[in-house]
């Protein structure tokens, strides 16, 4: 009986790759909710994906589920004409019902919170880099982590914590845990570090990677060939790493599509992922939520390892420092 209880209490982790599977997972858990849904979101567009999620939440609210949404105002800059807040003015349809439903609460403000998190009934935690918009559902490469663990949901709601096999790390309010956790995680690598990230420019992270390469650790980096922003900053980082790393221990690849994932894989069997980007603003200033998963969650780690290997096969290697014009270096300095 004790063994059965331990198995039941052990967190269960599932990985969804890309938007089709990720949004199917999100809708599934919204559909299963019975009491409470809590959502933290950066970008939420008024497009087919945004309306699909709103409709799903409306159905949950109609069942008596309380829905609490925290929407970051800074994300509005990325919503353009599909702005979330303007849907409040809708006089009919899904958005009118959404904003006027007594069981739906929307908290909107400038808090600098970049996290994308869902909690369902204090039992399920969904952590991702995906905003609610069509490009995340249909076009961009990204990851969602589903964790069934009341203890981890409580850790999220109370500002961070851990179970025996999972560590939730956050930047929130006065808590800034992401940089220290990432620093320690990278420095613990003995054999390999694999980064699959959209944006890479933080000076300390670059320095750690170069030092680890000289210590014999194999460094593999996968970046998007055509990111939505930060391209020249990425290329300056690539140039710096090629110059300062031990070349035989450094491989850099450019993925052909836009990848938005934030995966840091250490020695194949530990991973740190979530919403945090490898740029100073994200690591230090913005609200972020990341999860550190250890080797005991074998199935999830196998899926992440397999995904990374397939992504490398789709990518082209960078064999020499990129050539950058003076104006491109200025754009890189501006983190563009």
Q: Could you describe each region identified by the protein language model?
A:
Residues 3-36, 43-188, 199, 203, ...:
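HKD-type phospholipase D/PLD-like phosphodiesterase module
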Residues 61, 213-214:
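Gly/Ala-rich phosphate-binding loop of Rossmann-like dinucleotide-binding domains
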Residues 208-210:
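A structural signal for leucine-rich repeat
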Residues 269-336:
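Long, C-terminal catalytic modules of enzymes
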